[in-house]
């Protein structure tokens, strides 16, 4: 790590400790040239797979897009924001766990439906109706029947 004071390349770590929930490391460093001390924070960079859309276009994973879609389905439903965030984190973990560099958007949609089914059945039906392009009332009825099984 370069010294922020003199830009020297040689620095040493004096102290390291975990911060908060252990997802971050705080390091106290000292420059070996100018002897100034400074603090750095390290966080693991978790790379998400790229999303392959149905038209084969590839784009980076967009957590905000995932959140917006789930919140739209959950609109005016009694689900806490903590539960929504936990579901989003679970989906992100599932995506990373695939070990793939690219993942079809259809698979992400299936992960979202799994989580919505656990959170709120009405939100699940709302999302499924758009995601699976329900044509008529019969499609809704079939999906509701699956939920009741």
UniProtKB/Swiss-Prot annotation:
<keyword id="KW-0863">Zinc-finger</keyword>
<keyword id="KW-0547">Nucleotide-binding</keyword>
<keyword id="KW-0804">Transcription</keyword>
<protein>
    <recommendedName>
        <fullName>Transcriptional repressor NrdR</fullName>
    </recommendedName>
</protein>
<comment type="function">
    <text>Negatively regulates transcription of bacterial ribonucleotide reductase nrd genes and operons by binding to NrdR-boxes.</text>
</comment>
<dbReference type="InterPro" id="IPR055173">
    <property type="entry name" value="NrdR-like_N"/>
</dbReference>
<dbReference type="Pfam" id="PF22811">
    <property type="entry name" value="Zn_ribbon_NrdR"/>
</dbReference>
<keyword id="KW-0862">Zinc</keyword>
<keyword id="KW-0678">Repressor</keyword>
<dbReference type="InterPro" id="IPR003796">
    <property type="entry name" value="RNR_NrdR-like"/>
</dbReference>
<feature type="domain" description="ATP-cone">
    <location>
        <begin position="49"/>
        <end position="139"/>
    </location>
</feature>
<keyword id="KW-0479">Metal-binding</keyword>
<dbReference type="GO" id="GO:0003677">
    <property type="term" value="F:DNA binding"/>
</dbReference>
<keyword id="KW-0238">DNA-binding</keyword>
<keyword id="KW-0805">Transcription regulation</keyword>
<feature type="zinc finger region">
    <location>
        <begin position="3"/>
        <end position="34"/>
    </location>
</feature>
<dbReference type="GO" id="GO:0045892">
    <property type="term" value="P:negative regulation of DNA-templated transcription"/>
</dbReference>
<keyword id="KW-0067">ATP-binding</keyword>
<comment type="similarity">
    <text>Belongs to the NrdR family.</text>
</comment>
<dbReference type="InterPro" id="IPR005144">
    <property type="entry name" value="ATP-cone_dom"/>
</dbReference>
<dbReference type="Pfam" id="PF03477">
    <property type="entry name" value="ATP-cone"/>
</dbReference>
<dbReference type="GO" id="GO:0005524">
    <property type="term" value="F:ATP binding"/>
</dbReference>
<dbReference type="GO" id="GO:0008270">
    <property type="term" value="F:zinc ion binding"/>
</dbReference>
């Amino acid at each position: 790590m370069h010294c922020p004071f003199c830009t020297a390349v040689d620095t040493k770590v004096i102290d390291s400790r975990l911060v908060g929930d252990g997802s971050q490391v705080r390091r106290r460093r000292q420059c070996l040239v100018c002897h100034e001390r400074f603090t750095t924070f390290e966080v693991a960079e978790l790379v998400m797979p790229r999303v392959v859309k149905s038209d084969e276009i590839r784009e980076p994973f967009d957590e905000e897009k995932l959140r917006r879609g789930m919140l739209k389905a959950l609109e005016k439903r009694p689900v806490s924001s903590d539960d929504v965030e936990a579901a989003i984190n679970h989906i992100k973990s599932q995506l990373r766990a695939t070990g793939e560099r690219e993942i079809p958007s259809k698979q992400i949609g299936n992960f979202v439906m799994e989580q919505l089914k656990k959170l709120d059945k009405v939100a699940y039906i709302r999302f499924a109706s758009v995601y699976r392009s329900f044509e008529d009332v019969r499609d809704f009825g079939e999906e509701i029947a699956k939920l009741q099984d």
